[in-house]
Amino acid sequence: MEHIPEPDVAWLRDPGASVNRLTVHSTWRSRRPLQMLSSTWQVTGVSGTAAELIKRTPLQRDFEATSVPGVLEMDGAWVRREEEARRAAEAQGEPAPDQVRASILRREFILDAPPKDASERGWTMTLTFGGFTGPLYVWLDGIFVGFCADGFIPAAFDVTDALQPMHTHEISVLLMDSPACCHGLFREVSLEARPPAHVIDVIPQASHNGTSGSLRLRVEFSEASNTSTIRAALLGEAQQEEIWSASAPAGEDL
């Protein structure tokens, strides 16, 4: 997938747009290094043209605390600030037609030992937003990561090249107001490390009567790991009895 390095206001005109977003996949339990980035974030409400807000977001420094996951309309302090901003705008007269409201959210974090070790070994690092409302632009360490018009299903971005060699990292999010509903990062945010050879999707399919089924795995591997062997096993309900297993070199059918 070609990476687009700069944000564009034109994406806001396409309700189905997503930029640099990884392919949507099913969810399964994994032992990959995973760091949760929820809890306390910082937030501020802003107004201006979309182009002005995009330029401003990675540089913004005036914030107050909020909770993630959360809906901003349920954050009392945020609601009061928004009401004050609305009154101030009304006092200045009719806003320009290209003026928009948005929220800038920010989170600083230090990599935990497992993802830090994985990053130093060259593993792929992905940043996932479990759910959000309103168009979202995101930066990591000041580098544009991606855009998604809505996030009612998880949106993941490859941030391997965006992670800078520094002790403290910073996520900046521009979340445009949505006139249709409340907005905010309403599900978990996480950072995951993926090894050179890893499963990217699990697609099970069963017959209507449950007597047969199939499982398709989508596996991604780098040039350095193209000699890897894939092994799959089907276990009983107690996960002790191995009902079926098979193995094959990467790129071949099991």
Regions found by a protein language model. Give the residues of each.
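Accessory beta-strand-rich segments of carbohydrate-active enzymes
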Residues: 1-28, 42-48, 95, 99-201, ...
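Glycan-recognition and processing domains
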Residues: 69-71, 78-81, 179-183
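Short, solvent-exposed loop/linker segments at the N-terminal edge
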Residues: 206-213
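Predominantly extracellular/luminal regions of secreted and cell-surface proteins
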Residues: 40-77
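Beta-strand-rich binding/interaction modules
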Residues: 138-140, 213-250
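N-terminal helix-cap/turn-to-beta initiation motif at the start of protein domains
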Residues: 29-38
